[in-house]
Amino acid sequence: ILNDWKTETNGVRTAGWFQQFDLPNQNVKVFFVPVRHWSRRGLFDMNKRLWGGYVIQSDTATIYFGGDSGYGRHYKEVGELFTKIDYFLIGIGAYEPRWFMEANHNSPGDAIKAFQDSGAKTMVPMHFGRFNLSDEPPNEPLRALLEEAGELSLTDKIKVLTINESLEIK
């Protein structure tokens, strides 16, 4: 992922989509999974590195970190491979204007479709409300998400964390 920063001691590893990593001395597996975005760290390295999300599996829970992504079939593919996702962390902000942001950032409606595609039990929205990154007001993504979730009777499946709040997963 950060190949140029890789050293023998910093633990950075390169990964391909769906590659699995086992954490030493723990019953935890980490899978690097596809998202729809782009990458750039310098002037001449556009899309030279792979972008992605993660599925983290333990004996007690499976977490799907959807990364920074636009809507796509990858959500359904991940849900088909990992059939018991407990928590799906997905971006809901930085989506306006759609003509520019749609390929790389989910709208709240896209996030709900992705949640349904993934088959996860609980959605944890992220990537909203802290920084003004695009044209929608900072509070709009959560408002729109909860409105649409209410229309689809999904409100009880969404766990909203406040800024700096954590969620203990056992």
Model-predicted regions and their roles:
Residues 1-4, 62, 69-162:
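Cap/insert and terminal regions of metallo-dependent hydrolase folds
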Residues 2-16:
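Helix-loop-beta element that forms the nucleotide-linked donor phosphate-binding surface
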Residues 7, 40-42, 55, 109, ...:
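Residue-level detector of functional hotspots within protein domains
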Residues 8, 29, 138-140:
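Short low-complexity, flexible loop/linker segments enriched in glycine and/or proline
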Residues 10-13, 29, 122, 157-159:
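Conserved beta-strand segments of alpha/beta enzyme cores
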Residues 14-83, 163-170:
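Core dinuclear metal-dependent hydrolase active-site scaffold
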